[in-house]
């Protein structure tokens, strides 16, 4: 009898260990999947790591002073896209609203979806780089072989010349990286699948 009780305790103990390990693995996979969107959200809220600001209106003040803005494009592993700016750099007056274009093409034989993250260097300038319109605000799905032009409308906030850390900056780099994403399902589609299971 003593052996049976001890054996039951060992089985329960082993079950707890296995359950804990499985929960840990599932949690780590979930965190890995959520890391990019969570980090992106954190950076957008805080302006950390050169993240630009999203605005609804253009600047009222345009200075004579100019800044050179260079454009960078990257694609993360697992997303079979070509992605590049149409123009590598532009000289823009501080406060002037400008539109530039990036181009993406799906090299796969199936539809693929990506989401862009972005930053500005030098990092101190990120808080002064304001986007009015950007493809990075939503995920993008491209059909096989589809090519798409993606506009970005932005301005550099005139306040950049008043701050000690940023007033001497003459060149900014706007960089995008596209990451693979599972396409979002429309709410009606998710709801109908749930109802069918019930």
UniProtKB/Swiss-Prot annotation:
Topology versus the membrane: Single-pass type II membrane protein
InterPro entries, per the entry: CtaG/Cox11_dom_sf (IPR023471), Cyt_c_oxidase_assmbl_CtaG (IPR007533)
Topology, Cytoplasmic side: 1-12
GO molecular-function terms, A-Z: copper ion binding
Keywords assigned by UniProt, alphabetized: Cell inner membrane, Cell membrane, Copper, Membrane, Signal-anchor, Transmembrane, Transmembrane helix
UniProt topological domain (Periplasmic) ranges: 36-198
Keyword Transmembrane helix in record: yes
GO biological process: respiratory chain complex IV assembly
Main location class: membrane
Transmembrane feature ranges: 13-35
Keyword match Plastid: no
Family annotation (SUPFAM superfamilies): Ctag/Cox11
Any one Gene Ontology cellular component term annotated for this protein: plasma membrane
Subcellular location: Cell inner membrane
Function as written in the Swiss-Prot or TrEMBL entry: Exerts its effect at some terminal stage of cytochrome c oxidase synthesis, probably by being involved in the insertion of the copper B into subunit I.
Family indicated by similarity: Belongs to the COX11/CtaG family.
HAMAP family with a match to the protein in the record: CtaG
Protein name as catalogued: Cytochrome c oxidase assembly protein CtaG
Gene (name only): ctaG
């Amino acid at each position: 009898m003593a052996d049976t009780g001890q054996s039951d305790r060992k089985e329960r103990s082993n079950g707890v260990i296995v359950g804990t390990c499985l929960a840990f693995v599932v949690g780590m996979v979930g965190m890995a999947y959520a890391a990019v969107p969570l980090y992106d959200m954190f950076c957008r809220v805080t302006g950390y790591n050169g993240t630009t600001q999203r605005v609804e209106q253009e600047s009222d003040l345009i200075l004579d002073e100019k800044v050179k803005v260079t454009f960078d494009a990257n694609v993360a592993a697992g997303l079979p896209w070509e992605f590049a700016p149409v123009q590598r750099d532009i000289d823009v007056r501080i406060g002037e609203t400008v539109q530039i274009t990036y181009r993406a093409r799906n090299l796969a034989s199936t539809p693929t979806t990506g989401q862009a993250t972005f930053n500005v260097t030098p990092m101190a300038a990120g808080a002064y780089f304001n986007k009015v319109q950007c493809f990075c605000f939503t995920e993008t799905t491209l059909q096989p072989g589809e090519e798409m032009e993606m506009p970005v409308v932005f301005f550099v906030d005139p306040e950049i010349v008043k701050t000690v850390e940023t007033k001497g900056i003459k060149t900014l780099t706007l960089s995008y990286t596209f990451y693979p994403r599972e396409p979002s399902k429309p709410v009606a589609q998710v709801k109908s699948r749930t109802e069918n299971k019930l």
